[in-house]
Regions:
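A compositional/biophysical signature of low hydrophobicity enriched in polar/charged and small residues
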Residues: 1-72
Length: 72
Protein backbone atom coordinates (compact mmCIF):
# COMPACT_ATOMS: atom_id res chain seq x y z
CA UNK A 1 0.00 0.00 0.00
CA UNK A 2 1.06 3.55 -0.71
CA UNK A 3 0.06 6.32 1.68
CA UNK A 4 0.05 10.02 0.83
CA UNK A 5 -0.99 13.32 2.36
CA UNK A 6 -2.71 15.91 0.19
CA UNK A 7 -2.68 19.50 1.46
CA UNK A 8 -5.62 21.51 0.14
CA UNK A 9 -6.07 25.28 -0.14
CA UNK A 10 -9.71 26.32 -0.34
CA UNK A 11 -11.81 29.17 1.04
CA UNK A 12 -14.70 26.73 1.62
CA UNK A 13 -15.24 26.21 5.33
CA UNK A 14 -16.44 22.63 4.92
CA UNK A 15 -13.72 21.47 2.51
CA UNK A 16 -12.51 18.78 4.95
CA UNK A 17 -15.99 17.22 5.02
CA UNK A 18 -16.19 17.35 1.23
CA UNK A 19 -12.78 15.65 0.93
CA UNK A 20 -14.02 12.69 2.98
CA UNK A 21 -16.44 11.90 0.15
CA UNK A 22 -13.63 11.43 -2.39
CA UNK A 23 -12.90 7.80 -3.23
CA UNK A 24 -9.75 6.48 -1.47
CA UNK A 25 -9.57 9.40 1.01
CA UNK A 26 -9.28 7.62 4.38
CA UNK A 27 -9.25 10.68 6.59
CA UNK A 28 -9.61 14.43 6.24
CA UNK A 29 -9.43 17.28 8.70
CA UNK A 30 -9.10 21.09 8.74
CA UNK A 31 -5.72 22.64 9.57
CA UNK A 32 -4.30 26.08 10.22
CA UNK A 33 -1.50 27.63 8.19
CA UNK A 34 -0.93 27.93 4.44
CA UNK A 35 -3.43 25.18 3.68
CA UNK A 36 -6.98 24.70 4.92
CA UNK A 37 -7.36 20.91 5.00
CA UNK A 38 -5.44 17.65 4.84
CA UNK A 39 -6.60 14.50 3.08
CA UNK A 40 -4.93 11.19 3.93
CA UNK A 41 -5.12 8.72 1.07
CA UNK A 42 -4.09 5.10 0.77
CA UNK A 43 -3.86 3.33 -2.59
CA UNK A 44 -2.58 0.05 -3.97
CA UNK A 45 -0.27 1.58 -6.57
CA UNK A 46 1.67 4.84 -6.73
CA UNK A 47 0.06 5.83 -10.05
CA UNK A 48 -3.37 5.92 -8.35
CA UNK A 49 -2.32 8.96 -6.34
CA UNK A 50 -2.64 11.09 -9.47
CA UNK A 51 -6.24 9.91 -9.94
CA UNK A 52 -7.18 10.87 -6.39
CA UNK A 53 -5.45 14.26 -6.53
CA UNK A 54 -7.16 14.98 -9.85
CA UNK A 55 -10.55 14.29 -8.21
CA UNK A 56 -9.65 16.64 -5.36
CA UNK A 57 -8.49 19.39 -7.73
CA UNK A 58 -11.83 19.23 -9.57
CA UNK A 59 -13.79 20.09 -6.40
CA UNK A 60 -15.31 23.55 -6.69
CA UNK A 61 -13.35 26.03 -4.59
CA UNK A 62 -10.08 24.11 -4.44
CA UNK A 63 -7.38 26.64 -5.29
CA UNK A 64 -4.33 24.40 -5.08
CA UNK A 65 -2.99 21.17 -3.65
CA UNK A 66 0.35 19.79 -2.59
CA UNK A 67 0.94 16.06 -2.27
CA UNK A 68 3.47 14.26 -0.08
CA UNK A 69 4.04 10.53 -0.48
CA UNK A 70 5.16 8.36 2.43
CA UNK A 71 8.73 7.11 2.02
CA UNK A 72 9.65 3.79 3.56
Amino acid sequence: MVKAIVLVKSPKKLIAAILKQVNLVNESFPVSGQFDAVAVIQVERLVQIKDVTTQIQKISGVERTETMVEVQ
